[in-house]
């Protein structure tokens, strides 16, 4: 059973939003306070978002469908691939190609081309063609693999998508909404939560925060067949929470980790 504590969220810098001037007004309901011109997110609502997302993911997996992990920004890319691979799920971590969902059949043709080239490389076909042809085919393979390797085994549309940074992945969100595919996403204070089915209020820039959220989704997938849920431990009262926020109010840790949360 996954155990999530409010203190673990604080330690990952989950509560840090952007500068107050960058607030999307639709995020106001998720704001706890303001410190040094930085919005502080309400971790009670973050915990609820985690719980709702965990349960949705487990329902999707039990229905025999997959969750597509999406995160192409620098500080999310490696984490997205790592956690998607750990839970044997498809992922997009380099660039979202328009139509990956809405024009899925065409994208599948490109995936089949990639698989064919990979097969040619190992079945001896390359031994029977010229070096020039091999070079051309390798360039084509690398180009396809760069954007499609994470979805090679996604034979059908996913049952849900998990997204880091919905502002950056707006095209993916539009396609998922068009196809009525449930969207789970970490939403920072500059995001629009109203287009997300399961919004998780949180810092989508700091590496530790991104890693924590992505691991939680991966854990939900891996534990879906064990009939176990998630345990939320709210181990800080409001007074303690304010003290912790004051202690951790220096945003330098988040920035040093690859965040650009200002």
UniProtKB/Swiss-Prot annotation:
It holds the Pfam family Ribosomal_S2. CDD domains: RPS2. One of its GO terms (biological process) is translation. GO terms for cellular component: cytosolic small ribosomal subunit. SUPFAM superfamilies: Ribosomal protein S2. GO terms for molecular function: structural constituent of ribosome. This is Small ribosomal subunit protein uS2. It comes from Borreliella afzelii (strain PKo) (Borrelia afzelii).
């Amino acid at each position: 059973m996954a155990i999530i504590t409010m203190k673990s969220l604080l330690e990952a810098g989950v509560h840090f939003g952007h500068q107050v001037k960058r607030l999307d007004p639709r995020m106001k309901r998720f704001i706890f306070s303001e410190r040094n011109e930085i919005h502080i997110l309400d971790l009670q609502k973050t915990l609820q978002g985690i719980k709702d997302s965990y349960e949705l993911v487990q329902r999707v997996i039990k229905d025999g469908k997959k969750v597509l992990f999406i995160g192409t920004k620098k500080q999310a890319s490696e984490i997205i691939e790592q956690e998607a691979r750990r839970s044997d799920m498809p992922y997009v971590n380099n660039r979202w190609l328009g139509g990956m969902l809405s024009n899925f059949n065409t994208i599948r043709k490109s995936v089949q081309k990639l698989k064919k080239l990979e097969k040619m490389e190992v079945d001896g076909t390359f031994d029977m063609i010229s070096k020039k042809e091999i070079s051309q085919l390798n360039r084509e393979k690398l180009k396809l693999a760069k954007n499609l390797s994470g979805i090679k085994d996604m034979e059908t549309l996913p049952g849900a998508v998990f997204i880091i940074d919905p502002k950056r992945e707006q095209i993916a969100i539009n396609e998922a909404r068009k196809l009525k595919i449930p969207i789970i996403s970490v939403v920072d204070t500059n995001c629009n939560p109203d287009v997300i089915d399961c919004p998780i209020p949180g810092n989508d820039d700091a590496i530790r925060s991104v890693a924590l959220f992505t691991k939680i989704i991966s854990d939900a997938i891996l534990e879906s067949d064990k009939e176990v849920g998630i345990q939320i431990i709210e181990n800080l009262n409001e007074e303690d929470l304010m003290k912790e926020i004051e202690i951790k109010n220096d945003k330098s840790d988040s920035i040093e980790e690859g965040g650009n949360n200002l």
